Amino acid sequence: MLKPLFMDPYFNEKDWGGTRLKSVYGKPIPSDHTGESWEVSAHPMGLSACEGKTLPELIAEYGAQLTGTEVTGEFPLLIKLIDAREWLSVQVHPDDAYAQRVEGDPYGKTEAWVVLDCEPGAQLVFGIDCDNETLRSEIAQGRLDEHLVKVDVKVGDVLYIPAGTVHAIGANMLIYEVQQSSDRTYRLYAWGRNAELHIDKSLDVIDPKQGGKPMKGVKLAVEGGTREVMVLDPCFALERITATGRMPMKTDGTRFYAYTAVSDGKVIWDGGEHAYRAGQSFLIPAALGEYALEGGVLYKSYYPNVEKTVAELTALGVDMAHVGGKR
């Protein structure tokens, strides 16, 4: 088992979905309205798998060798590729406390996006410009859309979206998303489409102060390429890895690492190597030990020890103000 686990995703069909998961990444999508590829998922609504075993089955079989000694309880992350042919509904997600108290869910939903592809002039909804009391009144008057904050984005932009943030993906975008393992969404506005709305629960959880602009992140030169730290939050960390040569890595048994490649390369470990292509995702088990990435750009997500990671980055002179996350 101690090898990188290349995952077969679960596909989620959506009215707003399209075909770019196939045309860009060669994925065997089920229809021309495929909105999401759940790349790494132990969520019961859609399980990813490796060599015929679902991720929960692999976790049950290998335990901490796979997840790590510091990753306990429910598998914490859900990683997706999203093809938005049309605007998604304006929505918001609860935090852990609300999700557990009201919905009986183990997690709320903090997330982060990376814009993988978009058209010139692309925009996202990322926040609102009024308080919740005003928002309730404006919704009743049919004027919610006047208070949505839209931000311009381009390929490569990263947005950190904590629970409570009003947000929506714009049309004709391809997005990488890392989030807590939750499928709980409260819709505020559906652009005139026939979709169930959740106004009261949305207003319960909206934090009108959340929003802003894409994260700057910090770039570090490392052996074999660069490491860009974009988000460091108690829910997850997100880094962009550019392997211009052979980049040595190592696990210490405490946590797994999840990679999604956006260009081609290979992963090498003691006993083997495996090529990855753009759009593929793989897990590095916590007990793997030394491995290396050779070639390509990848997004790396993991469940961090925030205090330890902040100390390591600060020692390297990193300005943590440029890194998204609540710490």
Stretches with model-predicted labels:
Residues 129-141, 253-263:
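Short, basic/aromatic beta-hairpin or loop at an interaction surface
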Residues 1-130, 190-213, 238, 306-327:
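Transition-metal
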Residues 79-80, 88, 105, 111-114, ...:
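His/acidic/aromatic-lined binding-pocket segments of jelly-roll/cupin-type domains
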Residues 139-185:
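Loop-centered beta-sheet repeat module
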Residues 148-160, 174, 269-289:
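Short acidic-glycine-tyrosine-enriched beta hairpin
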Residues 247-248, 263-269, 281:
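Short beta-strand segments in beta-sandwich/barrel cores
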Residues 74, 82-87, 118-121, 165-185, ...:
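Ligand-binding loop in jelly-roll beta-barrel domains
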Residues 186-253:
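C-terminal amphipathic alpha-helical segment
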